[in-house]
Swiss-Prot record:
Record NCBIfam families: uS13_bact (TIGR03631)
Example of a GO cellular component annotation carried by this entry: small ribosomal subunit
Protein name, per record: Small ribosomal subunit protein uS13
InterPro entries named among the record's database cross-references: Rbsml_uS13_C, Ribosomal_uS13, Ribosomal_uS13-like_H2TH, Ribosomal_uS13_bac-type, Ribosomal_uS13_CS
Similarity comment: Belongs to the universal ribosomal protein uS13 family.
Presence of the UniProt keyword tRNA-binding in the record: yes
Gene Ontology molecular function terms on file: rRNA binding; structural constituent of ribosome; tRNA binding
Highest taxon above the source species: Bacteria
Subunit structure: Part of the 30S ribosomal subunit. Forms a loose heterodimer with protein S19. Forms two bridges to the 50S subunit in the 70S ribosome.
Gene designation: rpsM
Region Disordered, residue ranges: 93-118
Gene3D superfamilies documented for this protein: 1.10.8.50, 30s ribosomal protein s13, domain 2
Organism: Buchnera aphidicola subsp. Baizongia pistaciae (strain Bp)
Keywords linked to the UniProt accession: Ribonucleoprotein, Ribosomal protein, RNA-binding, rRNA-binding, tRNA-binding
GO BP field: translation
Length: 118
């Protein structure tokens, strides 16, 4: 198992798919990393040399990923809540933030229905 950005990555996966296991790296960024490091997207992690793995690690560290990105997201949400702005209040009430309807739908965000007592 290779270790990139503090995440264990399975050896049997292709490089592009394996990089997507890191929080903050999606398909586009994964392909960009492969392009910058001149590593073929079809190679599996198992077949990479130590130098290629080190190149991947260095390239991934140029982006904000994993714990730092999670911290940024939570701090930006907390900032909105502290400002008492509309978006912050929607986050606090656990309702949709971007103007979606809530009379029906929004069950994922609101959670399961609460039973009413008779």
């Amino acid at each position: 198992m290779a270790r990139i950005a503090g995440i264990n990555i399975a050896n049997h996966k292709h490089v592009v798919v394996a990089l997507m296991d890191v929080y903050g790296i999606g398909k586009t960024r994964s392909k960009l990393i492969c392009l910058r490091t001149n590593i073929s997207e079809s190679i599996k992690i198992l077949d990479l040399t130590k130098d290629q793995l080190e190149l991947l690690r260095c390239e991934v560290l140029k982006f904000v990923v994993e714990g730092d990105l999670r911290r940024e997201v939570t701090l930006s949400i907390k900032r909105l809540q502290d400002l008492n702005c509309y978006r912050g209040s929607r986050h606090r009430k656990k309702l949709p933030v971007r103007g979606q309807r809530t009379k029906t739908n929004a069950r994922t965000r609101k959670g399961p229905r609460k039973l009413m007592k008779k």
